[in-house]
A protein has these predicted regions:
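Phosphate/nucleotide-binding beta-alpha loop and adjacent structural elements of enzyme active sites
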Residues: 1-233
């Protein structure tokens, strides 16, 4: 079992097909995760970034298809707000000071799969600044049947009231055949979801995942502590 952390997203690498895997990078930012998937998985990557400034920086390399769209529960348009002094993806906070707004096309994962004729999606990476709840609430069981794994960053560290909703979503995903593996301590900032239809999760896999979780969690805590000490210095 090979678990790797890429930009604080845990991926079960050897559960991904070795031949022509498909990855959806939702909340692609500047494309670092998408580029990793191309280089290390040999994947064809569909990279979606809502912010046009960030979308313009997505790499132009073979097998990487960039799109300036927001991932949402349904197709349409969205008006988003971002802080002028920083670049982030997706669900921009309208209560921030010194902001600017823009309108962007929004797409559902189901319509994207249909448009591109994707029979199977090996990996969906979701990091869309809070919009992941709406997206997962609107995903059908028939869509999930075509997905191998999901690596999701929920944003309950910004809004703790999301946690009951997140727990309910994860229960539904379990009922749809996914093994739910929260990697983060105390929060849902890194959740790996594995579809049992395509990858069995045995007892020793669960032990390996638990070991990885605590090792990674300790490393993250130490890294944040060191960063705070460095800033104070």
């Amino acid at each position: 079992m090979k678990l790797v952390e890429v930009l604080q997203h845990t991926i079960w690498v050897d559960a991904i097909r070795s031949a022509e895997p498909i990855v959806l990078d939702c909340g692609a930012n500047r494309g670092d995760f998408a580029r990793w998937a191309v280089d290390h998985l040999g994947a064809t990557v569909y990279a979606f970034e809502a912010d046009p400034i960030l979308a313009a920086t997505l790499p132009t390399v073979p097998r990487l298809h960039p799109y300036n769209v927001a991932i949402a529960g349904e197709d349409g348009t969205m008006q988003l707000t971002r802080a002028k002094n920083r670049c982030t993806s997706a669900c921009f906070n309208p209560q921030l000071e010194d902001t600017e707004t823009f309108t962007v096309a929004s797409r559902s994962l189901e319509s994207i799969r249909q448009e591109h004729g994707l029979a199977f999606i090996d990996l969906i990476k979701l990091d869309i600044e809070g919009a992941e709840i709406e997206v997962l609430e609107n995903i059908s069981a028939s869509f999930l049947a075509h997905v191998g794994q999901i690596s999701c960053e929920f944003h309950d560290f910004l809004d703790a009231t999301q946690r009951p909703i997140i727990r309910k979503l994860l229960q539904r995903l379990q009922q749809s055949g996914f093994v739910v593996m929260p990697i983060s301590f105390w929060r849902y900032g890194d959740v790996l979801l594995i579809n049992r239809r395509f990858q069995s999760v045995r007892l020793w896999d669960r032990v390996a995942i638990a070991t990885y979780k605590y090792r990674t969690g300790i490393q993250r805590i130490l890294s944040r502590s060191l960063s705070r000490v460095t800033r104070r210095g």
